[in-house]
């Protein structure tokens, strides 16, 4: 069981490699906000001509088909607020969920592991 953030999910959806292997091998848990973050990340890549429209659509369809357990963020507010000094509310949502579930957080965002705020293991995968 792992919590996966949008950066790692995007890496898995768009590239072969460590992120895809981890996501294929584990039960995935995410805060609800991940779906919007994934759609936003794909949109940004498409606007920069780094991703075609058909590839973006396929990535969204693949994400939708994955067995992912989603959690409301409202139950994580207290911990999100506690770590607000060094993490955005978005990033803190992933950390708080991983802590609550007592599992690792998988991310492609190196700075997330450098804050010293997380009380859970963090695995950084290549983008």
Curated annotation (Swiss-Prot):
| Alphabetical list of CDD domains matching this protein | PIN_Pae0151-like
Please provide the record's keywords in A-Z order. Answer: Hydrolase, Magnesium, Metal-binding, Nuclease, Toxin-antitoxin system
The protein's GO terms of the molecular function aspect are: magnesium ion binding; RNA nuclease activity
EC number, as in UniProt: 3.1.-.-
Q: Which cofactor does it need?
A: Mg(2+)
Instruction: Please list the residues that bind Mg(2+).
Output: 5, 91
Does the UniProt entry include the keyword Magnesium? Answer: yes
Ranges for domain PINc come to 2-115
**UniProt cross-references to Pfam families, sorted A to Z:** PIN
The EC category is hydrolase
Quote the function comment for this protein.
Toxic component of a type II toxin-antitoxin (TA) system. An RNase.
UniProt record similarity statement: Belongs to the PINc/VapC protein family.
Name the chain's protein: VapC ribonuclease Mb0985
- Specify the species: Mycobacterium bovis (strain ATCC BAA-935 / AF2122/97)
């Amino acid at each position: 069981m792992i919590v996966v953030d949008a950066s790692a999910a995007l890496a898995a959806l768009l590239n072969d490699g460590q992120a895809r292997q981890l996501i294929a091998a584990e039960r995935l848990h995410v805060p609800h906000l991940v779906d919007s973050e994934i759609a936003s990340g794909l949109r940004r890549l498409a606007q920069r001509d780094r991703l075609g429209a058909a590839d973006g659509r396929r990535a969204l369809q693949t994400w939708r088909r994955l067995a992912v357990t989603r959690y409301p963020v409202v139950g994580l507010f207290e911990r999100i607020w506690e770590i607000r000094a060094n993490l955005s509310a978005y990033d803190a949502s992933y950390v708080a969920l991983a802590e609550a579930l007592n599992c690792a957080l998988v991310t492609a965002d190196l700075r997330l592991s450098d804050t010293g705020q997380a009380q859970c293991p963090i695995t950084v995968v290549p983008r």
